């Protein structure tokens, strides 16, 4: 099968429609050749609506070819909209726990990621369960290879799966509740990746138009109207209090956060982006999971000439093995920096000093990338939050 990774909209001498149809036919032929197998659909450790809906679509398509699939992830689903999506649609998910049997799977399928954002990538590699399919819309990362690859620079992975459905890999029917819920989840996945279709291209518009006939509008409204938790609001408040603005970039550290509240960081970045004269927001904090800690951050931008993937990779660099700390797509990005042996300190004063160190270092990286001077003088409130000196 082809491993060609050239963006499909850029294949010379051929229309996009012809190439995309070839991809759906190629996927169908591959699935037919693997009939009777059991596949693990691997999502990123912290799945979003695009990943959840795309994984579900792949599972339903694969079932037509006699392939049993399990949607699996290792982290958490903590964003309130993602929790609502899972509860309302009853998507079957498996959260990996240490010791779970992964040898039961014949192959892996990576949707909305290319193995760089899932710890399961290494777990499956260690037992020689090889990737069969990669479908994604992020920048090419070359972490893994698969027999079938469809990576496109478009708004959402859910757009690609909607296209597969439009081309006959699955038939949606308004009279079948599960198909209606799938269509609704795909619509939510596309909307969430494109700021309600504002950042979407023609592919997203066509996909949304197609899905509109099959979605449950009231369910979609229920998902979108879920209230923010108190903890999310607290993190947004911290982000507002601690933000520093330079050249229309708003950068803020929010201190230590529980792993359960990880999704509050991108929500805080979304909120900071709404401020007047801000085109890019970056929010980060230290996520604590037992004795493990890492700096986790989220970037949001509405500046059309700014590529979050390039920005984060150039600002933060990579590990000794060449794995970048950050990456992204159009309008959004994220990063993770392991803290290593400095994690797990129980002394409050040392933890305060550690946060101050990482906060200053991360800000320095971003200010250097932006090309402005270092952070303004800061003072600490009694709660340890950073405040600008006037």
Where are these regions (language model features)?
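A structured phosphate/pyrophosphate-recognition subdomain
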Residues: 3-41, 45-46, 56-67, 142-280, ...
């Amino acid at each position: 099968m082809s491993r060609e990774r050239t963006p499909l909209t850029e294949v010379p001498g051929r229309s996009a429609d012809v190439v995309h149809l070839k991809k759906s036919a190629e996927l169908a032929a591959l699935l037919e050749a693997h009939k009777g197998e059991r596949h693990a659909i691997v999502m990123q450790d912290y799945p979003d609506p695009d990943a959840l809906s795309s994984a579900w679509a792949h599972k339903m398509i694969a079932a037509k070819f006699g392939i049993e699939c399990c949607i699996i992830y290792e982290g958490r689903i903590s964003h309130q909209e993602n929790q609502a999506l899972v509860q309302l649609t009853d998507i079957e998910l498996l959260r990996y726990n240490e010791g779970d049997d992964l040898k039961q799977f014949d192959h892996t399928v990576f949707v909305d990621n290319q193995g760089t954002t899932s710890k399961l990538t290494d777990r499956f590699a260690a037992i020689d369960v090889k990737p069969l399919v990669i479908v994604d819309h992020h920048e090419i990362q070359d972490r893994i290879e698969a027999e079938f690859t469809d990576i496109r620079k478009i708004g959402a992975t859910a757009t690609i799966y909607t296209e597969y459905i439009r081309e006959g890999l699955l038939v949606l029917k308004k009279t079948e509740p599960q198909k209606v819920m799938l269509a609704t989840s795909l619509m939510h996945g596309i909307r969430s990746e494109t700021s309600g279709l504002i950042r979407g291209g023609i592919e997203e518009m066509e996909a949304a138009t197609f899905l509109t006939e099959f979605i449950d509008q009231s369910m979609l409204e229920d998902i979108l109207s879920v209230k923010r938790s108190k903890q999310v609001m607290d993190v947004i408040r911290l982000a507002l209090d601690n933000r520093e603005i330079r050249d229309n970039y708003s950068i803020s550290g929010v201190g230590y956060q529980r792993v359960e509240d990880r999704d509050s960081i991108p929500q805080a970045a979304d909120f900071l982006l709404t401020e007047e004269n801000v085109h890019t927001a970056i929010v980060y904090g230290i996520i604590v999971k037992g004795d493990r800690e890492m700096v986790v951050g989220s970037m949001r931008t509405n500046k059309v000439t700014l590529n979050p993937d390039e920005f984060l990779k150039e600002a933060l660099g990579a590990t000794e093995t060449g794995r970048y700390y950050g990456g992204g797509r159009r309008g959004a990005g994220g990063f993770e920096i392991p803290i290593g042996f400095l994690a797990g300190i129980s002394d409050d004063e040392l933890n305060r000093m550690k946060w101050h160190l990482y906060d200053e270092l991360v800000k320095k990286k971003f200010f250097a990338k932006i090309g402005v001077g270092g952070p303004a003088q800061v003072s600490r409130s009694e709660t340890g939050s950073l405040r600008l000196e006037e």
